[in-house]
Amino acid sequence: FYPQKDDLFWSTPFNKNLISSYSFDDALVAADYTKRMYEVEKGFSVPDLSYVVEPIKDVWLLAIDGNTYIPKNLKENSSNPSNYKGASIGYNNVLTNKKHLIEWVKNITAEAKKRSKTLIAFTHYPMIDFNDDASSEIEKLLGDKKWQLERVPQEEVAKVFSEAGIKIHFAGHMHINDTGSRKTENDFLVNIQVPSLAAYIPAYKILTIKSADKMEIETQILDDVPRFDELFPLYEKEFLALQKDSNKLSWNKDILKTKSYRELMLFHLKELVRLRMIPNDWPKDFIEKGQNLNGEDLLLLGYKGINRKIIQSKNFKKWTFDDLILDLYKFQSADELAKRDIPRERLEQYKVLVELFAENQSKDQFILQLKMLFKILSHLSNGEPSNHFEIDFKEKRIKNI
């Protein structure tokens, strides 16, 4: 948030100093919190902590503050923190209430191009749909308040920032691994969702600038972390305490038997799905109808009303409806990296089911819900490359390495 002595350049949307006249002392003055305020509504001043910095020669990091604090009541006190709406929906309110920020981004990208600087943008929030464009199907199946759908940026967000000159953007917040892109005749924007180090799948990204038009992204998975189990004895005490309270759901103690950090994170996801996601996200009747089914049952349901020869179904019995739901969350969290944790045979069987339910024209409510589920699974398992890949901005494409 603040300039360092070693920085070659540092500025904010409110600092008019150009790089040609840059000085660290001036940057320190401009970095003062009181000098980074704007009126979100008349009489309501709030901070915008965006900045651009050149930490190493010819690389500009553009930190965009996507938080937009909008007052609830214009007649109330502007200094009352509780009179402001939260900023958790991300970029959507930037378009209407932080137009100065968009203009500043345009100026920065133009200046970077003029001076042959590589510009890398980042913020807490995504610029592009992080559900591999399955958000409309997720809303139809689960409702508009599930799977963080309120945080999915409007398409206008990508359009505006792409036209402003942003080419690559890194985001967090969702704790998921994903790559999204938007292409027009003139622009190409890539949004990289960086996974969390403390959730499935634990990983970080390495960016290599190969040329002005090419960048390489590599995802490093944390399979092993020293002392990851050091606090397990304390969790065992928590488990024993939960056992004494019949009103509280208890997690599976077997998680404390995990042998690696990655295994721990996968078990953690499994418990999140069981204890939180299924009860909170999914229609109760849908789960009740599906919970006793296995893969073969789903296959036969998919064939209902379809004039097709039924394939060998015996191997579909190896997995259950619960496995399907968990695998869906694996893909939501880890994108293509989830394939490491799903048997190859089952992945092929999912492809068969995706095709069957896409073809199925039944009006039965449960079949329609399954149809939507497999459509979502297809989206999440076939997104842009998100493990090790190259972005070619000139050709406007992303390819696996």
Where are these regions (language model features)?
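Active-site-proximal beta-strand elements of phosphoester/diester hydrolases
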Residues: 59-68, 188-195, 218-220
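His/acidic metal-ligating clusters that form di-metal
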Residues: 54, 60-63, 71-184, 248-253, ...
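Hydrophobic residues embedded in beta-strands of well-ordered beta-sheets
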Residues: 60, 214-215, 398
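Extended active-site neighborhood of metal-dependent phosphoesterases/phosphodiesterases
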Residues: 1-103
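Short, solvent-exposed aromatic-acidic interface loops
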Residues: 218-229
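Non-catalytic terminal accessory segments
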Residues: 134, 227-401
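Active-site-adjacent helix-turn-beta-strand microarchitecture at beta-sheet edges
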Residues: 1, 43-47, 170, 179-185, ...
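Short Pro/Gly-enriched beta-strand edge/turn motifs at strand-loop
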Residues: 27-37, 163, 185-191
